[in-house]
């Protein structure tokens, strides 16, 4: 597991360095029979980075997509690293803004596997619309050492007609020879000068031949000068 964490950390540093160099960057590297594929897409006012690395027969696929456009900004990052295992990482950030509104979406997905299967999916949407303001952040991490690890994080937000909306979603799944799944769903709305904030955190850790599941759902909506906030946290550990 130490090798797995070290490999993931080194790839994350590489991703941070690459992110400052351009809007859409895809990097893939493989050795000793490994297969790696990286795809990055950025449309307007957006940054997208995808990095995949595989070795010793491992398979790594990283897909990053960011849209942004007009008064919206989207930042998407995906990393997949596999050593004799399979790592699939998918990250999507949307944003938009539309007609005077502003939106920021940030999405990060990391999947790393040693002889196992790691699947990570992250999506952050946000909107804005007219004079609304929306901010959305989603992070997903799946780490597997001869087991199955699945992490799924989705953060939405809206804002709409002058409101402020904020969403934060964080999901982590870690296993050592077992099965670990973590899913976090966060929604926020607001409208007409209202404010809404929602935060969700899900963590799942499992040991040898054990199964651990974590499910988190946080939802907050406000209408006409209202204010709402919701927070949800679920941490499950089976060592």
Where are these regions (language model features)?
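Gram-negative bacterial Sec-dependent N-terminal signal peptides
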Residues: 1-21
């Amino acid at each position: 597991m130490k090798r797995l964490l070290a490999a993931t950390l080194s790839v994350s540093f590489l991703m941070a360095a690459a992110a400052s160099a351009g809007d859409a960057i895809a990097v893939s590297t493989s050795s000793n029979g490994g297969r790696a594929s990286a795809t990055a897409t950025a449309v307007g006012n957006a940054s997208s980075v995808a990095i995949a690395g595989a070795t010793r027969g491992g398979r790594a696929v990283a897909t990053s997509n960011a849209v942004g456009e007009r008064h919206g900004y989207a930042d998407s990052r995906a990393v997949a690293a596999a050593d004799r295992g399979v790592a699939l990482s998918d990250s999507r950030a949307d944003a938009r803004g539309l007609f005077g509104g502003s939106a920021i979406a940030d999405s990060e997905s990391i999947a790393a596997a040693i002889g196992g299967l790691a699947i990570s999916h992250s999506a952050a949407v946000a909107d804005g619309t007219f004079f609304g303001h929306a901010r959305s952040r989603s992070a997903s991490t799946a780490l597997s050492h001869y087991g199955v690890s699945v992490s799924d994080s989705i953060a939405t937000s809206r804002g709409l007609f002058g409101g402020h909306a904020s969403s934060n979603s964080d999901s982590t799944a870690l296993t050592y020879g077992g099965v670990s799944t973590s899913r976090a769903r966060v929604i926020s709305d607001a409208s007409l000068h209202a404010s809404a904030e929602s935060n969700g955190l899900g963590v799942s850790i499992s040991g040898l031949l054990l199964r651990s599941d974590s499910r988190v759902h946080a939802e907050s909506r406000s209408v006409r000068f209202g204010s709402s906030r919701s927070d949800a946290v679920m941490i499950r550990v089976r060592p």
